[in-house]
Design a protein with these regions (language model features):
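Active-site-proximal loop/helix of nucleotide/amide-processing enzymes and allied scaffolds
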Residues: 2, 8, 12-100
């Protein structure tokens, strides 16, 4: 069904300041799940939901890599304590990002 979660899988872990983003693993999991889109989420142990430059770079890079496989990035969420932020929503509001259909 459209919009249904097909899989929720931890893909990486890191330390207080960074985590490796395995783009190929994300794409392979999406293909194996027969997904049309991917939502990515990660935490900020610092307690701030503000995206780092690396967070924004990951959003752009993942979106571009997914598009080459006819997949789209649904969202990239940052979670910090009881708060969350949609990077894709923020970027779309600023005119820096458009969602793939």
């Amino acid at each position: 069904a459209k919009g249904r979660e097909l899989s929720c899988v931890p893909i990486s872990s890191g330390n207080f300041s960074a985590a490796t983003v395995p783009y190929e693993k994300i794409i392979n999991l999406a293909i194996l799940s027969r997904a049309k889109s991917v939502a990515l989420a990660h935490n900020h142990p610092s307690g701030s939901v503000l995206p780092s430059e690396k967070d924004i770079d990951v959003t752009y890079t993942l979106s571009e890599k997914l598009e080459t496989m006819s997949l789209s990035l649904l969202d990239h969420i940052i979670i910090a304590g009881d708060e969350y932020l949609s990077i894709c929503d923020c970027m779309a509001r600023m005119g820096d990002f458009s969602f793939a259909d």
